């Protein structure tokens, strides 16, 4: 324990959150206790509360971590040249890769986040999560505006409703492909990849101007 005291608080928080993540993934958040997190992480319960006041703060820490990872994936997808459709495909593939690599984080990124910071009763991680989410929205907004300017996307697109709709539809499509892959293979005679390609292209057509070849 003496060695741990010499380490920065961020190291302890990351270690505890990592252990909690494993338990959340195995048992679910609601069914995991702080006692179990303490045991899994190798900290006493008293020490655990030095770094996190409760389980919700650990969840908030992990949600922020998930949003930061998602932002990195989106940034990489959009930081490339190419047509609007190519960049859209990059977004879809980055989300798919994110879900496959970090399935638990993918689920956390879909959770409702706090947007009311007019009072003092909020966690620092919640405000930072909101900020990262807004950075993601700005990147996608710029992508849509670039597509409209290029004549590839419809001019009547309402930016924020479109962004939120696409987050919901793309994430839902990815989860459906994961959870219903046996049905998709048996009844549709499609592989998971073929189903997703069809779904991604269908969604793109809903915002395409009609001038771009898909």
Per-segment meaning from a language model:
Residues 1-27, 31-40, 57:
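Basic, helix-initiating cap at the start of DNA-binding domains
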Residues 9, 59, 63, 67, ...:
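Amphipathic, non-transmembrane alpha-helical scaffold segments
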Residues 12-21, 37, 62-66, 70, ...:
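Generic hydrophobic, amphipathic alpha-helix propensity
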Residues 20, 41-52:
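Short hydrophobic/aromatic patch on the recognition helix
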Residues 25, 49-53, 61, 65:
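Base-recognition residues in the alpha-helical recognition helix of bacterial helix-turn-helix
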Residues 65, 75-104, 159-166:
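Hydrophobic alpha-helical connector segments
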Residues 97, 138, 142-150, 164, ...:
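C-terminal peripheral helix-coil segments that are non-catalytic and often amphipathic
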Residues 100-139, 160-163, 189:
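Short secondary-structure transition hinges
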């Amino acid at each position: 324990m003496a060695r741990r005291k010499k380490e920065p608080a961020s190291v302890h928080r990351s270690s505890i959150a990592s252990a909690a993540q494993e338990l959340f993934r195995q048992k679910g958040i609601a069914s995991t206790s702080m006692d179990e997190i303490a045991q899994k992480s190798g900290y006493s319960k008293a020490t655990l509360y030095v770094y996190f006041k409760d389980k919700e703060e650990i969840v908030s820490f992990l949600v922020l971590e998930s949003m930061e990872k998602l932002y990195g994936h989106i940034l990489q997808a959009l930081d490339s040249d190419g047509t609007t459709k190519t960049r859209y495909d990059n977004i879809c593939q980055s989300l798919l890769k994110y879900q496959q690599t970090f399935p638990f984080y993918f689920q956390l990124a879909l959770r409702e986040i706090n947007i009311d910071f007019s009072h003092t009763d909020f966690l620092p991680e919640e405000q930072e999560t909101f900020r990262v989410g807004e950075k993601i929205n700005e990147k996608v907004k710029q992508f849509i505006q670039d597509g409209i300017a290029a004549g590839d996307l419809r001019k009547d697109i309402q930016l924020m409703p479109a962004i939120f709709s696409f987050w919901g539809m793309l994430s839902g499509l990815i989860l459906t492909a994961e959870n219903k892959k046996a049905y998709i293979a048996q009844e549709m005679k499609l592989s998971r990849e073929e189903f997703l390609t069809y779904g991604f292209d269908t969604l793109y057509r809903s915002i395409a101007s009609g001038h771009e070849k898909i």
